[in-house]
Amino acid sequence: MKEQFNLIATAAAGLEAVVGREVRDLGYDCQVENGRVRFQGDVRAIIETNLWLRAADRIKIVVGSFPAKTFEELFQGVFALDWENYLPLGARFPISKAKCVKSKLHNEPSVQAISKKAVVKKLQKHYARPEGIPLMETGPEFKIEVSILKDVATVMIDTTGSSLFKRGYRTEKGGAPIKENMAAAILQLSNWYPDKPLIDPTCGSGTFCIEAAMIARKMAPGLRCSFAFEEWNWVSDRLIQEVRTEAAKKIDREIELDIMGCDIDARMVEIAKANAQAAGVAGDITFKQMRVQDLRSDKVNGVIISNPPYGERLSDDAGVTKLYAEMGQVFAPLKTWSKFILTSDEAFESKYGSPADKKRKLYNGTLKVDLYQYFGQRVKRQEVK
């Protein structure tokens, strides 16, 4: 088995730098590219990054890359890779995804079929199995992906399984919730730190508040999750347990937090409470049923983070316009507070009544959104009477 792997952490557009910082914080050098962060590591790195990365989507092993302008080149390129170092006899290895962009090969089902045939032939040769008899695929699953960009094929194995945004604490969700990894990334892009008050005035199922509490408490986001690699014979159960135990020991149970989530919908408030309970942070967050226009605070240097309803999520345009105007009026007196508002509404600033200090383009799934950033006038707390 291999001792070092070429690895990729995939990321939503606009979040690559956040994921890169997280990878470096774990001690791995990396290169940030569009939609991905490349790094190298051993089996422990595979476990740690799946367990700890908050903003990434998946961790993939790069088995190899090669030119592939024809199906013959694709077959020979896949066949030449060292599959015996990854796939034990009996493994299931579906070619779960093929993607062709700006390439001569563009029939994705054919790319999948030929890649599968090449892997089968390589394993038959390595394990001395007759070519005419199909391999028994009854063991652990290794999902293989083939990406062909500008006639260069990259072949990968997904180590994650269910996407990393599925933390395992969501009991229920609202109509269009923000993904957990997107919420964690926005918190890291904001100027919030655990010693500052945090309010989400349109909290829905509570994702921003829960992710903030998990960040503050140093809770590994994957601690409750299971991963594809846990079924693989060359990833030892002892090492997995060791990394999980180390992560559990890092949880900070002493820190005091000031996090509040509000929503006009009483049912969503109850869902948010249940989700926080499932995440183990119920005691860190105050959830209230409250309208945006009723929000007040005499605290300073806080942060407001909101993913309010917008056009694609709400059919009532007049209601959205009214909500944005109310936000502008209610947030204006909170001069020392920074505000971070995520919406796809390109007219948000005019409806809110103030231009943003900074705007950042992101994607919530396939939907293009902007993070409107308004920075507070920071003061020393003792200066405030």
Label the predicted regions:
Residues 2-142, 385:
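Non-catalytic nucleic-acid substrate-recognition regions in nucleic-acid-modifying enzymes
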Residues 48, 53, 162-167, 171, ...:
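Flexible, glycine-/basic-rich loop-and-beta segments that form/coincide
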Residues 100-103, 162-163, 309-313:
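A short, flexible beta-alpha/helix-coil linker loop
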Residues 144-160, 372:
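C-terminal edge-of-domain segments
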Residues 155-189:
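SAM-dependent Rossmann-like transferase core, predominantly class I methyltransferases
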Residues 178-296, 312-313, 317-319:
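Conserved S-adenosyl-L-methionine
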Residues 290-385:
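C-terminal catalytic and target-recognition region of SAM-dependent MTase-like enzymes
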